Design a protein with these regions (language model features):
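Hydrophobic faces of well-ordered beta-strands that scaffold small-molecule active sites
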Residues: 1-7, 23-27, 44-50, 80-84, ...
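N-terminal ordered "arm"
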Residues: 2-36
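Active-site beta-loop-alpha junctions enriched in small/polar residues
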Residues: 6-10, 28-32, 51-55, 87-89, ...
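Acidic (Asp/Glu)-rich catalytic clusters
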Residues: 14-20, 33-50, 64-80, 111-118, ...
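Gly/Pro-rich active-site loop or hairpin
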Residues: 56-63, 96-103, 169-230, 237, ...
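Active-site acidic/histidine proton-transfer and metal-coordination neighborhood
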Residues: 63-158, 168, 214, 250-251
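A short secondary-structure junction signal
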Residues: 132-135, 163-164, 170-173, 204
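C-terminal helical cap(s) of enzyme catalytic domains, especially alpha/beta-barrels
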Residues: 243-266
Length: 266
């Protein structure tokens, strides 16, 4: 099994010092990251995550996507596959939209990606919390396991299983994390995202890309007993000031060494 990790200057330092090893560096294809992308590609293939089209399952600009640019970018950065968030946002719909219409549109968007890109296509499960609703307009329909399974089954899309997102959704929906995970199409998992979460006053859980706790490693091991992904990607760390307080070099090193050992077993 291969290992990926979010780009950060701390990751680059660890790689250059031969302290850790990863197979992929994850980063979005945005102009503000041009230098980081160049450095990353000089060291490892890049797991592209974001191409600048505001990609999501209910994106209304799907007809404007430049597929040549998409495929050229994937090829140039040696990304093995590409994923889009399986997100349905309130701002994408009229108030009277039906659940059936939303599901149909998400499936059509997924099929458009599958039909037009030259690598395997994945959909990523979303987190569901008050901040995801308030800031991003996330609708509960897109985090329901039977909907995720339906779209994967009908379109043959692979699943990018984000364990932190699943934890957030399960907790904030009053469901056990293992029960929630078991309902997802684990047979379709091609990549796993893993990172620590943040608890708000002992009630709500949020995805803040923090250090993994022991519970996170336990959930990962359980998931790996149920599926066989190609890649595990650690999402701790990132570029710039936004991630500076959660890109501790020693914390990153310790997590990666542990994940390297896990990957060697599979």
């Amino acid at each position: 099994m291969l290992l990926g990790c979010n780009y950060s200057k701390e990751l680059i330092e660890l790689l250059q010092e031969n302290i850790v090893d990863v197979d992929y560096i994850k980063l979005g294809l945005y102009d503000i990251y041009n230098e980081a992308l160049e450095v990353s590609l000089s060291l490892r293939p890049v797991l592209l995550h974001g191409l600048g089209f505001n990609e999501r399952a209910t994106m209304k600009n799907i007809k404007d996507v430049d597929w040549k640019y998409v495929n050229d970018s994937i090829k140039n950065f040696k990304s093995p596959h590409y994923a889009v968030h399986l997100a349905s946002c309130m701002q994408d719909w009229d108030k009277d939209v039906t659940e059936e219409k939303i599901i149909e549109y998400m499936s059509e968007t997924t099929k458009a990606w599958i039909d037009n890109i030259e690598v395997p296509f994945l959909v990523e499960n979303m987190p569901y919390s008050s901040i995801d609703i308030k800031e991003f307009g996330i609708m509960d329909i897109c985090v329901k396991p039977h909907i995720i399974k339906k779209i994967c089954d009908e379109t043959k899309a692979h699943l990018l299983l984000d364990i932190a997102h699943a934890k957030v959704t399960a907790r904030n929906s009053g469901e056990d994390i293992y029960s929630y995970l078991e309902q997802l199409p684990l047979d379709r998992v091609k990549e796993i995202h893993i990172v620590g979460t943040h608890e708000i006053e002992g009630i709500e859980l949020r995805d803040y890309h923090l250090e993994m706790k022991e519970e996170d490693f336990e959930i990962l091991q359980w998931v790996l007993s149920k599926c066989s992904p190609d890649i595990i990607t650690l999402e701790y760390g990132g570029p710039g000031e936004l991630y500076s307080w959660r890109s501790d070099k020693n914390v990153l090193k310790n997590q990666l060494i542990r994940l390297m050992n896990i990957c060697r077993k599979y």
